[in-house]
């Protein structure tokens, strides 16, 4: 039986879930070094100043709009890290995935000055991943759900959009510009 080229292997989705969660944990770790400077009232963009710009914040929401005290921001970061660990281990991955998406979007909206395209890409992967069955392999499950799935491939629109997202990101690979940019970034050229 021929497989459709848009079908995703469920084992690779499980590994994708783990890798995305590890990326989130590394991101949380590095953001925590500058937590006070970037996300609190003692930093360069206090919440009251940011909210006073309605042309920027009128359509945005953020969990970090609840307050900007260092204690509250630290608690929110710890909750975010807890959901990322849950996503990595596969403990209620759908809930953890959506909560990680909400927290990352909240960070993005709280201080857009430090956001980059990697944040947008991670948001998109989390969004599409939450519609995929990425908990079928390599996930902590209850005793009643220990049997391995019979089918190891999954085909859906969310999977197709995930594949297209990766394809569009790496569309410059055949042009040869990716290698040039990498060598330039490494200082070889």
Label every model-predicted segment:
Residues 1-189:
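Alpha-helical membrane-anchoring segments
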């Amino acid at each position: 039986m021929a497989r459709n080229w848009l079908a995703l292997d469920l084992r690779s989705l499980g590994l994708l879930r783990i890798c995305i969660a590890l990326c989130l944990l590394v991101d949380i770790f590095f953001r925590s070094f500058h937590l006070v400077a970037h996300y609190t009232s003692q930093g360069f963009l206090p919440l009251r100043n940011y909210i006073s710009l309605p042309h920027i914040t009128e359509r945005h929401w953020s969990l970090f709009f609840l307050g900007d005290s260092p204690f509250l921001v630290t608690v929110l970061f710890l909750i975010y890290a807890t959901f990322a660990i849950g996503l990595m281990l596969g403990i209620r991955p759908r809930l953890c995935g959506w909560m990680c998406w909400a927290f990352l979007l909240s960070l993005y909206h709280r201080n857009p000055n430090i956001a980059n395209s990697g944040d947008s890409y991670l948001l998109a992967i989390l969004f599409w991943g939450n519609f995929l069955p990425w908990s079928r392999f390599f996930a902590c499950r209850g005793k009643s759900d220990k049997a391995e799935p019979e089918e190891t491939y999954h085909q859906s629109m969310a999977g197709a959009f995930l594949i297209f997202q990766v394809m569009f990101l790496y569309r410059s690979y055949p042009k040869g510009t990716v290698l040039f940019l990498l060598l330039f970034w490494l200082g070889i050229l």
